[in-house]
Amino acid sequence: LNLQGQELNPHTYSICKSDMLISGEDPDNIKLGSSLSEDHFEGKKFDYMITNPPFGVSWKSEKEFVDEESKNPYGRFKVGTPRSSDGSLLFLQHLISKMKDEGSRIGIVFNGSPLFTGDGGSGESNIRKWIIENDMLECVVSLPDQIFFNTGISTYIWIVTNKKKSQRIGKVQLIDGSTFYKPMKKSLGSKRKEISSEQTESLIQTYHKFEENEFSKIFDNEFFGFTKVTVEQPLIENGKEVTKKDGKLKPDTKLRDSERIPLTENVEEFFKREVKPHLPNSWMDREKDKVGYEINFTKYFYQYKPLRSLEDITSDLLELEKESKGIFKEIVNE
């Protein structure tokens, strides 16, 4: 077993080297510098990789270097780059570049942004598209909020691999671990919750069983994809539709809209069923089609809670009316 790593923050870097010394590992295996612009392990491949990159941190200071490498068809960022305000998905591409051909595994902790930020055709969406269509995303586990010292936001563990077990091929497992916690007796910064060893084991077993239940959902890769289709409507002038020189209708750019059509749907059939009845004169400009991917995690675990009955609400109001000494009755009678 050989442990290696890289850290940008000098303080954290020093702590890591000290920990390596205490553990009997070689502290020289820990390097100082940015993984994005100063890769100390260029060309090296690893079996297992774990990281918790900074949440929502700008990479503008390294933009020139990253943009240049993204032009290289063999570079780490060849698929695309996210917006410069959040470099999370750059770190994931960095790790994927270090996967062994015979199979590697990655565990990376993100906030919610990499799951859905960016519309079809954007850098973020193209990166998700590449990862999912190449069947590398194995599982996403949502964690409770308030488990980090310096932030109370919800976080997610992505498990990425280039060698899935046969039953997981073409599938993505989502695990809702947001309720797997116990409150701490004393807060530590923003950290007010912790995951017990029993709860950790329960999450691990949920992952290994690979079954659908209240906390686990399994989807085909294609489920997360959509085609963003541009919908046009004719330009009307003096009560008449305007045509172009080629005889085709001229679109009204002010009425231009788009539809996200799931990849599991036939685009033409969806358009006829969902759009045409409401916009009978509309048409699709298929030359502008863009395929995107997103994971709307909360939506998949949403559980409908029925509204209280009118009788229950009335009963409560009458009880309040009694307590308020007839004020409610006076208002209603008026």
Where are these regions (language model features)?
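Conserved SAM-binding strand-loop segment of SAM-dependent methyltransferases
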Residues: 25-35
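Short conserved loop adjoining the S-adenosyl-L-methionine
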Residues: 35-43
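A conserved structural/catalytic subdomain of Rossmann-like adenosyl-cofactor enzymes
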Residues: 43-329
